[in-house]
Amino acid sequence: METWQELKVTVKREGEELVSNLLIELGAQGVAIEDSMDYVGNVDRFGEIFPEVEQQEEIVVTAYYPETVDVATVESDLQARLAELTDFMDLGEVKMGTTALAEEDWADNWKKYYEPARITHDLTIVPSWTDYEATAGEMIIKLDPGMAFGTGTHPTTKMSLFALEQVLRGGETVLDVGTGSGVLSIASSLLGAKEIFAYDLDDVAVRVAQENIELNPGMENIHVAAGDLLKGVEIEADVIVANILADILIHLIDDAYRLVKDEGYLIMSGIIKDKWDMVRESAESAGFFLETHMVQGEWNTCVFKKTKDISGVIGG
């Protein structure tokens, strides 16, 4: 029987996506997130509110590695990568610990963290192994979070989905930059976009996105490819969406302005509070006008329009 290794990394909530993606890059076969906030204010399908639980500033990212992987080296490499990023993000005191578990435990252990989650008015994310019956008007996104990139319930993803609901009316061309799990592309298709082109620099993300897309019927209008932001892209779009770190976002803004159609939208998420002014000023300097600004905790998401200036703030 094969033995797996479970590496737990405790970090501030803001570091969830960053640490998850780094662990995948370092060979993890699956990642699970433990976050007390997942239960706070959550409402199930019958209107029952889950009991309040103690809200922690920290979350636990659990990564699973085969016994053949030297997890001590993974820990060392992760510490080194995180040390390079301390100027960009406050990760708090990073703590790590490793335990061994049998294959049957690995097969089920990470699944216990994932349940169907109603993310927006219309969209519900459902783990691929769950038998879930949609209610009237409910749109289902099937994901396999065991492969990589979490379940799509991170605040930056949630706000991106809200923004897509806000701007998509049907028939649009969408560019999804840094697609990760592919959740934003799948949502765009469900919300009526005609064509979606999804890009990611990471070959693992390209594969995972394609696999998640195939879990959802009728997604033939989504095209996934490896790409470095919008470099070399010549597709005009009605909507461009990017949920990546702020220091990377600013490098795609000029290309986004070139590619987005008049009256089109640029949705940007993954912006921590300290980087918001930098991103806003960069977008406005390129010619965009801020239409909507959403805030949840330390995270910011924004909707910019190419020609129209309507400002609004939604706080969360």
UniProtKB/Swiss-Prot annotation:
| GO function term, MF aspect, one | protein-lysine N-methyltransferase activity
Q: What is its EC number?
A: 2.1.1.-
Q: Write down the Pfam families for this protein, in alphabetical order.
A: PrmA (PF06325)
- Where's it mainly located? cytoplasm
Q: Which reaction does it catalyse?
A: L-lysyl-[protein] + 3 S-adenosyl-L-methionine = N(6),N(6),N(6)-trimethyl-L-lysyl-[protein] + 3 S-adenosyl-L-homocysteine + 3 H(+)
Q: Where in the cell is it found?
A: Cytoplasm
Keyword RNA-binding belongs to the record:
no
| GO biological-process terms attached to the record | methylation
Q: Mind telling me which GO cellular component terms the entry cites? A: cytoplasm
User: Is 4Fe-4S among the key words of this record?
Assistant: no
Keyword list (alphabetical) reads:
Cytoplasm, Methyltransferase, S-adenosyl-L-methionine, Transferase
Kindly give the Gene3D superfamilies that the UniProt entry links to this protein. Vaccinia Virus protein VP39
Residues at which S-adenosyl-L-methionine binds: T157, G178, D200, N243
- Similarity comment text for this entry: Belongs to the methyltransferase superfamily. PrmA family.
Function according to Swiss-Prot or TrEMBL: Methylates ribosomal protein L11.
Protein's name in the database: Ribosomal protein L11 methyltransferase
Q: Where does this protein come from, organism-wise?
A: Streptococcus pneumoniae (strain Hungary19A-6)
Gene from which this protein is expressed: prmA
